[in-house]
Amino acid sequence: MLVCIPEVLPKSEVAEFRRLMDAADWEDGRSTAGAQSAMVKRNEQLPPDSDLARALGRRIVSALTGNPKFVSAAVPLQIFPPLFNRYAASGGHHFGIHVDNAVRGDHLTGLRIRTDLSVTLFLAEPDEYDGGELVIEDTYGSHEVKLAAGDAVLYPSTSLHMVTPVTRGARVASFFWLQSMIRDAQARSMIYDLDNAIQALVERLGRDDPETVKLTGIYHNLIRYWAEV
């Protein structure tokens, strides 16, 4: 399940992020890559332990946990501290096909998560750079994602994916992973579809409609059945 989430951050906040990031020191992005990923990763990254990366990351997590679409699709249990990368044409940056590590650990907080879902939050407008598409492969083929600044995409961490070479400008983004309360991707997808159907019925029939109440009960009972907390 691939879900695009618009306007996670307003344009004004994106501009503030970019101003702070443009003034920061960047390092080789391979510092946080696994052995296989490091072979195909060419980009820059804000030092993950820097005060700036941590502060901006907390703002992103706060925005996402208050976003109903994100919460519905992810059913998040633990969110890894967001990281930040930059793909510049001048550096020939790209990230070849790879799969994310199954487990991520943060040595500052001691947090360890199973990576169920991956998130990319775009911080550069599509017309700022050429190339740099996030290409995600699943059983239905390849999907190219290049969203407006402030928008995010959520997809299974089991997916093979890549970032195509940037040939003009620079692609700036935040990326991170999360552990869902619902481990099984198919179950999580059904929960998301059910929640969307319930919200549509609420709009048409009202929250107090008996059938809407019954479906809401089924939704919560399925969460209770599948959740690992």
UniProtKB/Swiss-Prot annotation:
Residues 78-180 form the Fe2OG dioxygenase domain. Its cofactor is Fe(2+); L-ascorbate. InterPro entries: Oxoglu/Fe-dep_dioxygenase_dom, PKHD_C, PKHD_hydroxylase, Pro_4_hyd_alph, Pro_4_hyd_alph_FE2OG_OXY. Keywords: Dioxygenase, Iron, Metal-binding, Oxidoreductase, Vitamin C. It comes from the Bacteria. It is an enzyme of class 1 (oxidoreductase). The keyword DNA repair does not apply. The keyword ATP-binding does not apply. It holds the Pfam family PKHD_C. Its EC number is 1.14.11.-. GO terms for molecular function: 2-oxoglutarate-dependent dioxygenase activity; iron ion binding; L-ascorbic acid binding. This is PKHD-type hydroxylase RPA3479. It comes from Rhodopseudomonas palustris (strain ATCC BAA-98 / CGA009). The lineage of its organism: Bacteria, Pseudomonadati, Pseudomonadota, Alphaproteobacteria, Hyphomicrobiales.
